[in-house]
């Protein structure tokens, strides 16, 4: 983010509702085009600078994008201060991609391990190189992506561009092929032995030259796997999170959380273990885990019962006890079969400064203050209109969908996904009534329906809970119109700007305000 951007951001009133605009789309599919399962995006993450974006898909690939407009702002300081709109269009471009994970088979457990990327987390950059962690269900990998100078092999004895038949070398010239080169040390596809397609020039080859390797001024990003962290989880990994110390990270599965050092791949420490002595006594599982953004000794993890636990690594080596427990006060009245299912927390995110914590369950988005454990300080209704349809959602397994959430860098807004490729943006600042429903398409406001707010209700004498977005009978005004097969599960908020990247199947949509 450059100086011009900071001036524009400062001049805008953060309390005013944002007007979201379409920015870019990558991998947009045409009407009626079938989406391949391996192309569906399963993870999205901005780096700390916001200049790079990574996506992972079900095919085990990681695709990197880089920002191209960071130095394009123009105008005097006065013009920037007087502007009440963003002066530039945020733009990213494709940088590179690599195969992070491949399908595997666990012969001991007779279990297939999918290549699908579950999570991506960026690490600190060093010496112009990018570092990131990616994980599937069982294995975490540490990647280094760095621009390398392209090397070319020049002054070949035969011209790889002049071929006959199946592509074998056909001619040689001492004068015309001096500049013929093969990039990055590659070789043209020639047969190991002479065949009918190969012909020598008239008079034969007068002399042989030694090819020369030349380093050009061009560069190309190259991804290398630096370390593999494996064989530490018996259950599927659902979370990885970097520590603010830049040296360690955690990985979490259904029953355990492990602490790793980035430099050591053959050893980890189990810091949370919720596995009971008898599995029939199991009452809840870990659903998400996240390090505190500034305190390297603190982390939070959520459970399938709707609770969030804050733990302090300084208390003990095995953090079976928590320092704080955040959960919704138990509601009076009968409970249904679906009560515990819809209470399960699918994702948690710390705000940038670390005081507030955002959580998403099936029905709501909640904001918590880590200094107050009496209950959430705000609750935002996302799927309230689906309550009458819980039986149908259970039958088609949609009730188990895990929607992610994200919070803006300034902590004033939060976003989460829904069905029919819709996502919701809420103002989470005290007193804010901002809500917006957008569609992951080139026209994000096409299906926008204003959603009235509901007054705050008191939770206790200490805190008040704001509940909004619950009065609408449905995002579309008709729940039958919702398409439960098109769901927006993954999205990320730019760390410094009001810009959101979200995944609709195999397409990556980006919006700005």
UniProtKB/Swiss-Prot annotation:
- UniProt keywords, alphabetically: Acetylation, Repeat, WD repeat
Q: Which InterPro entries match?
A: PP2A_PR55, PP2A_PR55_CS, WD40/YVTN_repeat-like_dom_sf, WD40_repeat_dom_sf, WD40_rpt
Q: What is this protein called?
A: Serine/threonine protein phosphatase 2A 55 kDa regulatory subunit B alpha isoform
Annotated PANTHER family? PROTEIN PHOSPHATASE PP2A REGULATORY SUBUNIT B
Q: Name one GO cellular component term.
A: protein phosphatase type 2A complex
**Which species does the entry assign this protein to?**
Arabidopsis thaliana
Q: Which residues carry this modification: N-acetylmethionine?
A: 1
Instruction: List residue spans for each WD repeat.
Output: 36-75, 112-153, 232-270, 281-321, 340-378, 483-513
Q: What does this protein do?
A: The B regulatory subunit may modulate substrate selectivity and catalytic activity, and may also direct the localization of the catalytic enzyme to a particular subcellular compartment.
Q: Where is the signal peptide?
A: none
What protein family is recorded? Answer: Belongs to the phosphatase 2A regulatory subunit B family.
Q: Relate the assembly described in the record.
A: PP2A consists of a common heteromeric enzyme, composed of a catalytic subunit (subunits C), a constant regulatory subunit (subunit A), and a variety of regulatory subunits such as subunits B (the R2/B/PR55/B55, R3/B''/PR72/PR130/PR59 and R5/B'/B56 families). Interacts with SIC/RON3.
Q: Offer one Pfam family short name for this entry.
A: WD40
SMART domains associated with the record: WD40
Task: Enumerate the PROSITE patterns for this protein.
Answer: PR55_1, PR55_2, WD_REPEATS_1
Say yes or no: keyword Repeat present: yes
Q: In which tissues is it expressed?
A: Expressed ubiquitously.
């Amino acid at each position: 983010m450059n100086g011009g951007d900071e001036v524009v951001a400062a001049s805008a009133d953060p309390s005013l509702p944002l007007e979201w605009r379409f920015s870019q789309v990558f991998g947009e599919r045409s009407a009626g085009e079938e989406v391949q399962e391996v192309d569906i995006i399963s993870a999205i993450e901005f780096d700390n600078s916001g200049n790079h974006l990574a996506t992972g898909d079900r095919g085990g690939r990681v695709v990197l994008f880089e920002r191209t407009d960071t130095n394009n702002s123009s105008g005097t300081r006065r013009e920037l201060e007087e502007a009440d709109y963003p002066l530039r269009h945020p733009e990213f471009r494709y940088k590179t991609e690599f195969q992070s994970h491949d399908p595997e088979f666990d012969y001991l457990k007779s279990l297939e391990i999918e290549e699908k990327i579950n999570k991506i987390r960026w690490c600190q950059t060093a010496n112009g190189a990018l570092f990131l962690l990616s994980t599937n269900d069982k294995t975490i990998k540490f990647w280094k992506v760095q621009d390398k100078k392209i090397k070319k092999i020049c002054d070949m004895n035969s011209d790889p561009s002049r071929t006959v038949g199946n592509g074998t070398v056909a001619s040689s010239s001492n004068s015309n092929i001096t500049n013929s080169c093969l990039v990055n040390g590659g070789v043209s596809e020639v047969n190991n032995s002479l065949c009918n397609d190969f012909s020598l020039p008239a008079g034969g080859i007068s002399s042989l030259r030694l090819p020369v390797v030349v380093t050009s001024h061009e560069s190309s990003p190259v991804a290398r796997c630096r370390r593999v962290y494996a064989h530490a989880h018996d259950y599927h990994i659902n979370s990885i999170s970097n520590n603010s110390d830049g040296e360690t990270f955690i990985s979490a599965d259904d029953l355990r959380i492990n602490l790793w050092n980035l430099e050591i791949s053959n050893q980890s420490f189990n810091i949370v273990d919720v596995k009971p002595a008898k599995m029939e006594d199991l009452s809840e599982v870990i659903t998400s885990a996240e390090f505190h953004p500034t305190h390297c000794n603190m982390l939070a993890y959520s459970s399938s019962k709707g609770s969030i636990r804050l733990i302090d690594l300084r208390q003990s080596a095995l953090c079976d006890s928590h320092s704080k427990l955040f959960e919704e006060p138990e509601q009076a009245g009968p409970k249904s079969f679906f009560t515990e299912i819809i209470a399960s927390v699918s994702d948690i995110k710390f705000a940038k400064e670390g005081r507030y914590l955002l959580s998403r369950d099936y029905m709501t988005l909640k904001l918590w203050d880590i200094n107050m454990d009496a209950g959430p300080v705000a609750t935002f209704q996302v799927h309230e209109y689906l309550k009458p349809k819980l039986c149908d959602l259970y039958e088609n397994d949609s009730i188990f969908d895990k929607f992610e959430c994200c919070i803006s860098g300034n902590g004033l807004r939060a976003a989460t996904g829904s069905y029919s490729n819709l996502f919701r943006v809420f103002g989470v600042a005290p007193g804010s009534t901002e809500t917006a429903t957008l569609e992951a398409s080139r026209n994000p406001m096409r299906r926008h329906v204003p959603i009235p707010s509901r007054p705050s209700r008191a939770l206790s004498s200490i805190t008040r809970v704001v509940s909004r977005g619950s009065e609408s009978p449905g995002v579309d005004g008709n729940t039958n119109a919702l398409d439960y097969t098109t769901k927006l599960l993954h999205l990320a908020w730019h760390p410094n700007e009001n810009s959101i990247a979200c995944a609709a199947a195999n397409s990556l949509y980006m919006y700005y305000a």
